[in-house]
């Protein structure tokens, strides 16, 4: 119980610190939320969205799952996206993967993990789709590249959702970004697949894949 009690103690200290810095902080926070950003990231405990972006409570709407997937049958994720886009009217959606992702590695190595294997089939599909590129790489670079490809594919998936297609059609200004986080250095990397409408979604996706192929060619 001691470890659990520590969490409560930490919370009390955190709350006290914020109130000392801004006495009206929680009163203002309780009134409403109006975040400009939706973060779709991995569940990995080493990727704390608010801390690594330097944002405060109320500034970042967050959805996390294993390997930061956006799947058209995942009502959990899509409900979050629809609320963020249609109700909160966020301006930016960030899909962020990370190097050293256990989900990506498990999708490649395919160990028997139970139910999670079904979830990881979506990454295995990406692995097979880009096998001609990935198959030529050493293992570490292959996993890093698959992490980046996974982000690009999820940006593409989200952009083709009815939620985003409808938002763009009605002229709503909401941009999708694809990033990768380095646990080894704490830095975010923009994968240059930013989409602001249906046209740029296709263009930036093709551009991102081409960049990865060029990057691989330069490593040969």
Swiss-Prot record:
Where on this chain does Zn(2+) bind?
42, 44, 98, 101
Among the GO biological process terms of this entry, one is:
carbon utilization
Q: Which GO terms describe its cellular component?
A: cytosol
Relay the cofactor remark from the entry. Answer: Binds 1 zinc ion per subunit.
Q: Which SMART domains match?
A: Pro_CA (SM00947)
- Residues annotated as transmembrane: none
Q: Which UniProt keywords apply?
A: Lyase, Metal-binding, Zinc
Q: Which reaction does it catalyse?
A: hydrogencarbonate + H(+) = CO2 + H2O
Q: Which Pfam families match?
A: Pro_CA
Tell me which cofactor or cofactors this protein depends on: Zn(2+)
| EC number in record | 4.2.1.1
Q: Which CDD domains match?
A: beta_CA_cladeA (cd00883)
The family line of this record is: Belongs to the beta-class carbonic anhydrase family.
What's the subunit arrangement here?
Homodimer.
Q: What is this protein's name?
A: Carbonic anhydrase 2
Annotated organism of origin: Escherichia coli (strain K12)
Native organism taxonomy: Bacteria, Pseudomonadati, Pseudomonadota, Gammaproteobacteria, Enterobacterales
